[in-house]
Amino acid sequence: MGPSSSYPRVVAVLNGKGGVGKTTTAVNLAAALAAKERVLLVDADPQGSASWWAERGTAALGFDLAQETNPRLLESLREVGGYSLVVVDTPPALDSAALAAVVQAADQLVLPTPPAPLDLAVLIETVHRAVLPSGTSHRVLLTRVDPRSLGEAVEAQRTLRERGIPAFEAFIRAYKAHERAALEGLSILQWRGKNAREAEADYRRVAEELDRDWRK
């Protein structure tokens, strides 16, 4: 069941492994969702990557950002006022009290992972250790997909289906645009350069899938 109209919906982006595109997903998904929602991005990762990203830019990202790692405060994410949607960039440590607090508070978990077998194995472990016990709605998002060959991503989706783990239909393809946008403190929706439109379209498709889910 989703939150009532007086409370924001909470979407947490998590994976127990670093380097999978977690912060990139959180920032760009927040930007894509902000086209229709008033969005707050909460940086709950002690590394502060989302905050670093935002501080590099001079233009507004299209959403507000707050840094918070206190588990007691993270338990109350649904009580945040003034927003219809809260996106959380979580810490990568599965035994983190902050992560546990966010998972319990979340309405939806987005689980980014590259489609490579080793990355997928770590993601499946994350699902069993941190996601399934919570009972929170979740979907895997395949990231860093080679745009020249989608076969590995298709195979990864098949593996997830066989294990009963839901996944987004959309992929996030690997473009240099993502790194360059981050270095300039911009979301992929704001960055202008090679493959910018393709990269933006990927995140808009993910946002549309989430929106369809919420309207069911």
Swiss-Prot record:
<keyword id="KW-0963">Cytoplasm</keyword>
<dbReference type="InterPro" id="IPR003593">
    <property type="entry name" value="AAA+_ATPase"/>
</dbReference>
<comment type="function">
    <text>McdA and McdB together mediate carboxysome (Cb) spacing, size, ultrastructure and probably inheritance in the cell, together they prevent Cb aggregation. McdA is an ATPase that forms dynamic gradients on the nucleoid in response to adapter protein McdB, which associates with carboxysomes. The interplay between McdA gradients on the nucleoid and McdB-bound carboxysomes result in the equal spacing of Cbs along the cell length.</text>
</comment>
<dbReference type="Pfam" id="PF01656">
    <property type="entry name" value="CbiA"/>
</dbReference>
<keyword id="KW-0120">Carbon dioxide fixation</keyword>
<keyword id="KW-0067">ATP-binding</keyword>
<feature type="binding site">
    <location>
        <position position="47"/>
    </location>
    <ligand>
        <name>ATP</name>
    </ligand>
</feature>
<dbReference type="InterPro" id="IPR050678">
    <property type="entry name" value="DNA_Partitioning_ATPase"/>
</dbReference>
<dbReference type="GO" id="GO:0015977">
    <property type="term" value="P:carbon fixation"/>
</dbReference>
<keyword id="KW-0479">Metal-binding</keyword>
<dbReference type="InterPro" id="IPR002586">
    <property type="entry name" value="CobQ/CobB/MinD/ParA_Nub-bd_dom"/>
</dbReference>
<feature type="binding site">
    <location>
        <position position="21"/>
    </location>
    <ligand>
        <name>ATP</name>
    </ligand>
</feature>
<dbReference type="GO" id="GO:0016887">
    <property type="term" value="F:ATP hydrolysis activity"/>
</dbReference>
<feature type="binding site">
    <location>
        <position position="24"/>
    </location>
    <ligand>
        <name>ATP</name>
    </ligand>
</feature>
<feature type="binding site">
    <location>
        <position position="19"/>
    </location>
    <ligand>
        <name>ATP</name>
    </ligand>
</feature>
<dbReference type="GO" id="GO:0046872">
    <property type="term" value="F:metal ion binding"/>
</dbReference>
<comment type="similarity">
    <text>Belongs to the ParA family. McdA subfamily.</text>
</comment>
<protein>
    <recommendedName>
        <fullName>Maintenance of carboxysome distribution protein A</fullName>
        <ecNumber>3.6.4.-</ecNumber>
    </recommendedName>
</protein>
<dbReference type="InterPro" id="IPR027417">
    <property type="entry name" value="P-loop_NTPase"/>
</dbReference>
<dbReference type="GO" id="GO:0009295">
    <property type="term" value="C:nucleoid"/>
</dbReference>
<keyword id="KW-0547">Nucleotide-binding</keyword>
<feature type="binding site">
    <location>
        <position position="18"/>
    </location>
    <ligand>
        <name>ATP</name>
    </ligand>
</feature>
<keyword id="KW-0378">Hydrolase</keyword>
<comment type="subunit">
    <text>Homodimerizes in the presence of ATP. Each subunit binds 1 ATP molecule; some residues cross the dimer interface to contact ATP in the other subunit. Forms a complex with McdB.</text>
</comment>
<feature type="binding site">
    <location>
        <position position="23"/>
    </location>
    <ligand>
        <name>Mg(2+)</name>
    </ligand>
</feature>
<comment type="function">
    <text>Incorrect positioning (aggregation) of carboxysomes results in reduced CO(2) fixation by encapsulated ribulose-1,5-bisphosphate carboxylase (RuBisCO, cbbL/cbbS), which leads to slower growth.</text>
</comment>
<keyword id="KW-0460">Magnesium</keyword>
<dbReference type="GO" id="GO:0005737">
    <property type="term" value="C:cytoplasm"/>
</dbReference>
<dbReference type="GO" id="GO:0005524">
    <property type="term" value="F:ATP binding"/>
</dbReference>
<feature type="binding site">
    <location>
        <position position="23"/>
    </location>
    <ligand>
        <name>ATP</name>
    </ligand>
</feature>
<feature type="binding site">
    <location>
        <position position="22"/>
    </location>
    <ligand>
        <name>ATP</name>
    </ligand>
</feature>
